[in-house]
Each structure stands twice: as C-alpha cells, then as structure tokens.
Curated annotation (Swiss-Prot):
Transmembrane segments: none annotated. The keyword Metal-binding applies. The gene is cysI. Pathway: Sulfur metabolism; hydrogen sulfide biosynthesis; hydrogen sulfide from sulfite (NADPH route): step 1/1. This is Sulfite reductase [NADPH] hemoprotein beta-component. Its EC number is 1.8.1.2. Belongs to the nitrite and sulfite reductase 4Fe-4S domain family. Siroheme binds at residue 487. GO terms for biological process: cysteine biosynthetic process; hydrogen sulfide biosynthetic process; sulfate assimilation. Component of the sulfite reductase complex that catalyzes the 6-electron reduction of sulfite to sulfide. This is one of several activities required for the biosynthesis of L-cysteine from sulfate. SUPFAM superfamilies: Nitrite and sulphite reductase 4Fe-4S domain-like, Nitrite/Sulfite reductase N-terminal domain-like. The keyword Coiled coil does not apply.
Length: 573
C-alpha cells in the first residue's frame, strides 16, 4: 500500500538530527537563553541553549586546565564564554579597535584573538558579563549576529594593500553579502540589546533560512588574484575577483570547499571548492543567496558529520549544482574567466597603495594580541589606534594591516612601531611567517591536543632542521589544529598537524603553496620526537634535490614522499 504524503513526511522527520528539532522549536533562536543568563546559581546555560547561543555569536566554554582540579573539589567547571564579532572583510576603524581593546580588558581575559576568518574573538567572558559585552560591541557599530551557527558565517575578503580602490569595492561586496544573508529573527536584539519583543512569533518569518536554518555552517570568501590569502578553495562559496583594465568586472565562483572531518570516519574529509562559472559583480549577492538556498534544500539534515555543502556538491555533482543555480537565478552563469594565484600568505611590512597612502602589515604570531613582559603588543596597537586616521584590516593569516596611512602619519606610526619593537616578521623564517594555529587548549571544548600554545616552540625545533638543510629562507606553509574541525585550514598546508590526543598529532604533507591542493596523511598519532625525526630526512632531501623555485609541497609529491591529492574523495585513499 502506498504511503501518504503525511506518512512519508513523518518518516523523514524521524530521521532528522536532534539539532534540527531544537532549531525548529527554538522560537527563532530564542530558546531559554534569557532565562539562563538570569540564573545566578551556575556559570553556565542549558545544553540546548548553548547550541542556540552560537547563532548569536558566542560559545560556552570552560578552562580545561582547571577541569580536573575543580572536579576533585566537586565544583562545576570554570565556565566562561567566547564571543566572536561579525566583521565582514576584516575591516575595522581605529575607534572600533579601541572599543574591542576595552572589552577585552574589562570583560575578557585581557587578550584579543585575530581569527583565521578575519575577525575578533574574546575569551574568558563570565556569564554575568556576557550581555554587557554584547552591548558594548554593538555600541561600536559592530555585532556578533551569525558569527557562529548553521548560517552564513563571517564573509571574508582579501585585505589587498596594493589597489585601495579595488579593495574598497570587494570589501563592500563582502559587507553586502554578509548583511543580505543575515537571519531576520529579532531574537538577537531582544536578548542582548533590550529590543522590543515580538509578542506573536507566528508573525515572524525567516524568508531565506526557514525555521531550521541551514544543515550546517556556511562560509563565503572573496579572493583577489594573485593573492589567495583567504584560501578561496576552502570556502563553501569562493569568489575570485576578476579585474580587467583596473576595473572589477565580476567573480569566478567556486562551490563546495571545506576543511572539517572526523578522525576515523572516512566518509568525512576536507575538500577543495570546484569552479562553477563567472558572474557579473552586480549579480554576486543574488548568486550567493541562491547557492545558499540549494544547500538549505538539498543539504543533509540527518547526519551533521555529512551536512556541509561540500558533501552536497559531491553527492549532486557540480554540473547539477550549476543547473539548479541557473534555474533559481532565471539566467545562466558564464564560463570561468582566466586568473592565476601566486601565493596565499601576507605581504609584510610597509607597502605603498594607490592615491599616496601606505599600509603596514604587522606579523602577529597565531593572531594573539596581548602584552607580555618583553613584548607590549596590545599596548602598542592601542597607541597606534589613538593616532591612526585610516583603518585596521585583519588578515586571513591572523596578521594585522595598519591600512590607509597618510604620508603625514607614516612617520608617527613608524616611531611607535620602533618604540615598542613591533615586527613585520621579515626577521623570521619563511616557515614561521607562514604559520597558523587555532586556539585549542585551554578554552576550546573540541581540542584533543595543544595548538596555539605549542606550535611556536615546535617551529623553533623545525627551524634548526631548516638551517641544517640550508632552506631556512624558503617560504613553507605550516598549520596546526587541536582537532580535525580545521579552523586554521590545515588540510591546505604544505606541513600540517591535526591533534589526536594530548601531545599526539597526525602529520600531513603536500598541500599546495597557493592554497590550491589538499595535503596527504604521512604519519599518524605521533609525538614531537617522531615529528622531528620524520621531517629531518625530507628537509635534507629538499635542500639538496629541489628544483629551482620548487615549493616544499610540490617537492614531497614529486619525490614520492606522499601521493598527490586530487580532491576530497581521495584524501583518505
């Protein structure tokens, strides 16, 4: 007997991941967050509300360094909250920098984290300070809406210090895309900004997302050749700016990139975006919306481990995705235009832009802005912000560009750089300059191993090997994450470490220097000694046998150390 539509619908609903029900029943992301914030008996909120809180730009965390001791004392974990700002294109004014600095000093752990998606993160905010922190962020004309959660996340763009007029235009598109793809619910303003409450939520709608929002997070980034600093192939939607006669004419579109996977589950894998076509710049916002709705309608809502857009694209095929996109647009996107990437790192130090302005790219190891006894980075940047008349651009490599510096201000800012001993990184090895690490311990609940706190010291030991091999000047990308979620985009690095357990990592080799190719597992679950013992002969061979201009990632493939990865489906093979 044939099943009725109602029966089929009920059976389908039974298969959904539990979070799909939570979103559907959350009253458009309200849940009981407000009540949880008001509860003085715990530093936490409910498990369900922690999942909804992500859509508001915050994660509940605890200090994992203190877990065991607090458990022995029969105390609840040392709960705190991370807040992530929505900052399309990573551009902030000096006034906004000062506001972020104040928030970090007054409510967080006195540091700022510049993320791999070009925004600010605050760590260590106590529940009683969470709402005040949110208000202070909004008072600076920034917000945290959709910085996390199953929605479009912070839209990235190339912080190009060369062509200021092109950068301004693509940054505007990053902002337009971000604003257009925001959730429409009033929940954020009600909870954090004391906005007027919607009395009848049945009147509230999410015309683009619907009550369940997306199956998983969604990421968009804009690259501007020759720089692939945003790692365009790691994005769910990658936009590659096409400039003709010094005019931005449109974007090549890639679909289905993503870094995350699950250890031991070969059905999960990182993937590079595939070229879909070219679109005129005037249509790019609509194109992004239509692609997002394809993921909304076709994405996997039964298994969150296979819910990212990359799996949807792999399941349907790029041609089917393009066909569906053309149908939803009502017109056909064009064939991709020619372009070429040369690198995915930052251009450090002073660079002259057009119209007579200057830009200084400051090297900030792993994006952590803090003061230490011998390096007053946070204080120095505050002093610069107090006099700077241009803007600040957070780079996708966790560095900072002091941008649009007038000739009149350049000497004053250089004086502050000298006074505080700030560095553009040119005195470091190419390996350290091209390094990235996620936060991991002690705050990230997903971390299996150290990352930000460990990578700098590991690099120092690898640098000894580079010096021995005579390749310490070579630009080599190295990245580390404490878990396989891929926040520092490790699967695209020439050398990568993904945490498996405290002190143990999977080591991957052979990513593309331009961010165009995934790397390959070389050794599994190894500690520092084996890491160094494994790398030494490879680096020695690289020093002796590399071709002129050959990057390390290309060398390890040519020499047979690892096989070339052509796409996510053969990442584990």
């Amino acid at each position: 007997m044939a099943k009725t539509n109602k029966q089929m619908s009920e059976e389908l609903d039974k298969k959904l991941d539990a979070l799909e029900y939570l979103k559907d029943e959350s009253n458009y992301l309200r849940g009981t967050i407000e009540q949880g914030l008001a509860d003085p008996l715990t530093g936490a909120i409910s498990d369900d509300d922690t999942k909804l809180l992500k859509f508001h730009g915050s994660y509940q965390q605890d200090d994992r360094d203190l877990r065991d001791e607090r458990r022995k004392q029969k105390l609840e974990p040392a709960y705190s909250f991370m807040i992530r700002v929505r900052l399309p294109g990573g551009t902030a004014t000096p006034e906004q920098w000062l506001a972020m600095d104040d928030i970090s000093n007054n409510y967080a752990n006195q540091t700022l984290k510049l993320t791999t998606r070009q925004t600010f993160q605050f760590h260590g905010i106590l529940k009683r300070n969470l709402k005040t922190s949110m208000k202070k962020i909004n008072e600076s004309v920034l917000d945290t809406i959709a910085a996390c959660g199953d929605v479009n996340r912070n839209t990235m763009c190339n912080p190009n210090p060369y062509q200021s007029h092109i950068h301004k235009e693509i940054n505007n598109y990053a902002t337009k895309i971000s604003d257009h793809l925001l959730p429409k619910t009033n929940a954020y303003h009600e909870i954090w900004l004391d906005g007027e409450k919607v009395l009848d939520s049945s009147e509230e709608i999410e015309p683009m997302y619907g009550k369940k929002y997306l199956p998983r997070k969604f990421k968009i980034g804009i690259a501007l050749p020759p720089s692939n600093d945003i790692d365009v192939y790691s994005q769910d939607i990658g936009l590659i700016g096409i400039v003709e006669d010094e005019t931005l004419v449109g974007f090549n579109v890639t679909v289905g990139g993503g870094m995350g996977m699950t250890h031991g589950n070969t059905d999960t894998y990182p993937q590079v975006g595939r070229l879909a076509g070219f679109v005129p710049k005037e249509q790019v916002v609509d194109v992004c919306e239509k692609i997002l709705t394809i993921q909304r309608d076709y994405g996997n809502r039964e298994n969150r481990k296979n819910a990212r857009f990359k799996y949807t694209v792999d399941r349907l095929g790029v041609d089917k995705v393009v066909e569906e996109l053309n149908t939803r647009l009502g017109w056909e996107i064009e064939e991709p235009r020619d372009f070429e990437f040369e690198h995915n790192g930052d251009r450090l130090g002073w660079i002259e832009g057009d119209k007579g302005v200057w830009n200084y790219t400051l090297f900030i190891q792993n994006g952590r802005v803090k003061d230490t006894e011998d390096y007053q980075l946070k204080t120095a940047l505050r002093k610069i912000a107090e006099t700077h008349t241009g803007d600040f651009r957070l780079s996708p490599n966790q560095n900072l560009i002091i941008a649009n510096v007038t000739p009149e201000k350049k000497e004053e800012i250089q004086s502050l750089i000298d006074q505080y001993g700030l560095t553009d990184g040119k005195n470091y090895t190419g390996l350290r300059r091209n390094s990235m690490a996620c936060v991991a311990f002690p705050t990230c609940g997903l971390a299996m191993a150290e990352s930000e706190r460990y990578l700098p010291s590991l690099i120092s030991k690898i640098e000894d090997l580079l010096d021995e091999a005579g390749v310490d000047d070579e630009e080599i990308t190295i990245r580390m994450t404490g878990c396989p979620n891929g926040c520092a985009r490790p699967a695209l690095a020439e050398i990568a470490f993904i945490g498996k357990a405290p002190g143990k990592y999977n080591m991957y080799l052979g990513g593309g220097f331009k961010g165009e190719r995934l790397n390959k597992l070389y050794k599994e679950n190894i500690g520092e000694q084996e890491i160094l013992e494994s790398l030494r002969p490879i680096l020695m061979d690289y020093g002796k046998e590399r071709l002129e201009g050959e990057h390390f990632g290309d060398f390890v493939i040519r020499s047979g150390v690892v096989a070339k990865v052509h796409g996510g489906q053969d990442f584990h093979s």
